[in-house]
Structures are given as C-alpha cells and as structure tokens.
C-alpha cells in the first residue's frame, strides 16, 4: 500500500488543548464523585442500613443527582470532541493508505451497484488499530434517478470511546482517485449518553 497521509494525534491538537481538556474532565469527574459521596452520606444518615437509606432519598433527589451526573458526562464528551477531534481531507485511490494516530485507513477497492432508486459508487476501506483489523467501512456516492441529485453517504464505525467516519467527496483524475474525508471523534457518544441521563432526571 502507498502511504499518502500520516498524522499523530498529538500533532493534530492545539498546544493549549491538553491542559484545557484535562481540566474539564477533572471538573466533570469531581461533579460525579461529589454526588456519589453525597448519596452515600445521606443514605447512611437514616441509620437503617445503606440500601434502606437509598430507597428513602426520594424521587426529587434522585432526579437532581441524575441531571447533574448527566451534565458531567455530557461535558466530558463535549470536551473530548472539541479538543481531540481530528478531520483530514486526503486524495486517495485504491491501494492508498492514510493514518491518524494508531488508526490506519486503507482504500482497498471501488465497486458500482444499483439501488432501488439510485446508482452508487461504493468504496471499501479497511480500518485497523495498531495493526489489528477493526472494521471495513463502505462510504458511497449516490446519484438518485428521479432528481439526478448526488448524495454522499458517509460510513461510520460507532463505539463507546470514539467514532470513525469515512466519506467520499469528488472523483479526481477521471475517477482513479477520490477526495476522501476521514474523521476521528472521541467521546461523541458521551454527549448523547449525558443528555439521556439528564432527561431521566
């Protein structure tokens, strides 16, 4: 494979981001642990056993705890995405490889297929982490029959700690290469998880 782009996660970040990110994460953790400590103290204050005390804390109190802990999780997610997200626009063709940190993206091949109401050019990207296979992503460029509109369908590998995205832009060199956009988004799911926890509160 031909290496067309290599970027370490450290080089992709602003100089100030590590300290700001660490501070935000520490504040989020402090908020969670402070509420855990408060729950334990209040439950024990009833003097009737820890689990009995938990049941007596009341819905309003649990709602407040859930809302604040959800906020902490959401802040942690926003911090990770804001300071550690990486986006790369790269010229790639079949056989090319690009790396972001320990993740390698290999443009393996292209094929064409016909959907129910569109024609598609589909890419096949092998993704590995520290040399171990992770997933094969299949971004598409679709042309819809009725309108003639061309749409980009990004391929996503979603995970608890990070999401990986690959999207195909415009063909280059008569289709021998493509403008490819690769995203590394850490903690993006934490934003939705935190919002969900807050909603329960």
Language model features: what each stretch is:
Residues 7-201:
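Solvent-exposed, non-transmembrane regions of integral membrane proteins
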Residues 1-6:
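Short, exposed "boundary/linker" segments that immediately precede the start
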